[in-house]
Amino acid sequence: MPPTQAESVIKNIIREIGQECAAHGEITSETVVAFMVKAVVLDPSNGFNMDRTLVKTDVQKLVKLCVARLLDNKNPSLDTIKMQVYFDMNYTSREDFLEEHHRVLESRLGIVSREITDTRACAKEELENLYRKIVSYVLLRSGLGSPTDIKIVREATAALQSVFPQAELCTFLTLSKKDKERQLKELTMIVTGIRLFNRDCGKGGEGIDDLPAILLEAIPATTHHIDSQLQIAQEQAFRYTAIIEKVTNNPLMAKELQPYMLKEALYNVRQYEIFLQTVLSDIITCAEEVELMTKQLAAQLEQLKMTVKSKTAVPTSQVFPIFIALASLWTSFQDETVLISVLSNLTTNLELFLGTHDLLFPEKVMQGLLDGVIVKTDMTRIEEHLEEKVQLADFRVLEWLFPETTANFNKLLIQYRGFCGYTFAVTDGLLLPGNPTIGILKYKEKYYTFNSRDAAYSFAENPDHYINLIKEKAKKNAELIQLLELHQQFETLIPYSQMKDVDKHFIKPITKCENGTQTDTHILPPTIVRSYEWNEWELRRKAIQLANLRQKMTHSVQTDLSHMRRDNASQVYPLKEVGTQSKREGSTRVPRPQIFIAGLRGGQSKTTHGVKINLTRAVDET
């Protein structure tokens, strides 16, 4: 059968089942009907062949079985399926919810934004009308009051005029559409910050709720309510578990209590407990965020007061960023308020799927079943086998993980949501919490925990056998597919909320072990820096010395002839001792010159007559 034809047949079957239920006064959503169709087809006791095309008789049988199960209001299994479908359709993660919430707000404001950005106003009345639309847009986007309240409109208009006078509309109209949208968002943030600051100063704040105070009151109340509901659900689960353990050991009693659907009731309350824990985790995150934002809000307001004080005018570059930060914080408060409201309503609506417990198991019936039974909590069961551990020497092929040898031990995705797979398989559906400290079995890239060491050893002998038993049990009780997170084995029944968690199945364990390494004493040659100083004061002393030298001047004495001199370099040969010797010795003597001048002293006559007399002896006379 082609895919399109098969889809058409399935839609017709779902529509027919819905009409049959409506005829009997039971209004059922198409999602629940579709899930029930898949659950009935999966159940091997109904005799449907997944590989064979459905004939008319098969369709009639399928419709009849689905209608019968959907009209059985005393079946805890039906309530569990409805609870799972409701939670899947109404719960999203914190990040996805806030993203969708902001997207819805943007889509609602799109009409008002387009009226402002697409206008071509020119006349005075048109400009005034445009300004009023901007005020309405600011109020709608900020969520601080109704745009129909005259007091709120006046306050918002006054705040807007202080940063965006009406005279600037002409400039605003000349901007591009994207710039207009950006400026509208920026004006909204600034006006919101101004109104919040005025409210804190006691000068305004009309229509602004005290969100921090509301959240500080709502979060503890919601947390207390969920804690109380969680405690009731856990106590009920502990009682059902104790009764089922008693029944398992008594075959005659098990036959008598088979119509009471004890295990289906246990699955219902366990699923409710898991959903409450999910919601409680989100609310705790909200409480942490609100506590942090409250401190930031007080700090921003105090900074703004210190900046403004009693000044008549403050630069926009100083106050506008603080106004925008205030508005952003207030938007986060609004997000947390909406999220808390949604989670609170979700918790309240989950209680509607617990009605069968009072019908099937009133207090008198429970007291009779609990006669002589010791009710144990999950923690008590874990503590009973706390000292037991799997011995690695007993297993050569299988891999076991322990908290001492695995760094991300608490982050591993345990199969069957942490319940003991062996106990569930051998008792035909009893849910007992696994104890990770005994050891986590890693088998085919999946991780399993057990409530005792004996259960771990038995499961390890033939894991595939017990895994198949659990899968067959899940086919009979379709609510176990989501309760035990068996989506990979039944891909057609993966809920939308679980699709984004597929990556969690691929978390690898980070094992730890003791290793030793040895290196050479000195791989590299030593490099000693003589100028290195470890003393801080010595470094300061050198810094001061350099600073002082920087301010000093060098003096020199130069003359007119020496100021052009420069350094020169010359090269000489080194000195050495040398001796010479001649063949003979000789000497000469020259006569000493003796020349005299007579008559220099003068005489009787006035004229001096000098006579030069050479008395030098001849050379040959010496």
UniProtKB/Swiss-Prot annotation:
Cellular component aspect of the GO annotation: axoneme; ciliary basal body; motile cilium; radial spoke
Protein's name in the database: Cilia- and flagella-associated protein 206
InterPro entries registered for this protein in UniProt: FAP206 (IPR021897)
Recorded family membership: Belongs to the CFAP206 family.
PANTHER family noted in UniProt: CILIA- AND FLAGELLA-ASSOCIATED PROTEIN 206
The protein's role, per its UniProt record: Essential for sperm motility and is involved in the regulation of the beating frequency of motile cilia on the epithelial cells of the respiratory tract. Required for the establishment of radial spokes in sperm flagella.
Primary site of residence: cytoplasm
UniProt KW keywords: Cell projection, Cilium, Cilium biogenesis/degradation, Cytoplasm, Cytoskeleton
Pfam families in the record: FAP206 (PF12018)
Lineage: Eukaryota, Metazoa, Chordata, Craniata, Vertebrata
Any single GO BP term: regulation of cilium beat frequency
Localization terms from the record: Cytoplasm, Cytoskeleton, Cilium axoneme; Cytoplasm, Cytoskeleton, Cilium basal body
